[in-house]
Amino acid sequence: MSIKFKKVDYIYSPETPMEKKGLDNVSFELADNSFVALIGHTGSGKSTLMQHFNALLKPSAGVINIVGYHITPETSNKNLKRLRKKVSLVFQFPEVQLFENTVLEDIEFGPKNFGATEEEAKNKALKWMKKVGISEELASKSPFELSGGQMRRVAIAGVMAIEPQILCLDEPAAGLDPKSRHDMMQLFLDYQKAGHTVILVTHNMDDVAEYANDVLVMEKGKLIKHDTPENIFADRKWLKKHNLSEPVTGIFASELNNYKFLKNPLTIDQLIDGIKNNLEGEFYE
């Protein structure tokens, strides 16, 4: 079941001197089981848009259809708990949301809140601890005794233990070292490949190029482009006009004098293949 936004507006502090439009006539449709990147400058409306996916914010105007739910300004909050099991959000620096006495209890909280038994919640917690790289030996420790990176992993495991159909992530790898970042992004990619939709808010264009198959670009509350990474990063004039960077692979390829690439390489593997083809007298295709 696709995600569909139709002419969605969102207004902060309506009918007050602080009134501000956070979303302006936003319409799009996303396919199931896709990996979607949501990009744009700070203040462009990315996080506001993300919070509409599970109705943490409801539209001031327009309609949202998602996992069988029809959301309008009049939708009652009473009907949204099951939606939030199907669509979960991971905010930037999610470790600040930790609150339980032990790592295990913190990860178990989400499944229990949505009806899992003690045994089911424990099994899910242990499963996702392993997947995010947290040793079972830490299960009985306070999450506040862990390193910053470990706390991040615990917080993400707590959301993923709910096993939502749609996982929304706001800069989840911000501040992590390169290896931890790669491992975390690979975890999200594996989750998408297992039959889920992943929506990633990010400023990192390398992650967009490496992982996404669909991109939404926000600017001043408006959706200004919806396309594939290949098409978006191929249009350097458009990127420059909107002050958006491109992946380091594309920048590197453009600096190689006398090398020709028929396609803009999005990943390291594509860049290497393109260089090899040039050295062998063939263009990258």
From Swiss-Prot:
Give the UniProt subcellular location, in the record's own words: Cell membrane
- MF terms (GO), sorted A to Z: ATP binding; ATP hydrolysis activity; ATPase-coupled transmembrane transporter activity
Q: Which family does it belong to?
A: Belongs to the ABC transporter superfamily. Energy-coupling factor EcfA family.
Is Transport one of the keywords UniProt gives this record? Answer: yes
Q: What class of enzyme is it?
A: translocase
This one is known as Energy-coupling factor transporter ATP-binding protein EcfA2
Membrane topology reported for the UniProt record: Peripheral membrane protein
Q: Ranges for the ABC transporter domain?
A: 3-245
Q: DNA repair as a keyword?
A: no
- SMART domains documented for this protein: AAA (SM00382)
PROSITE patterns attached here?
ABC_TRANSPORTER_1, ABC_TRANSPORTER_2, CBIO
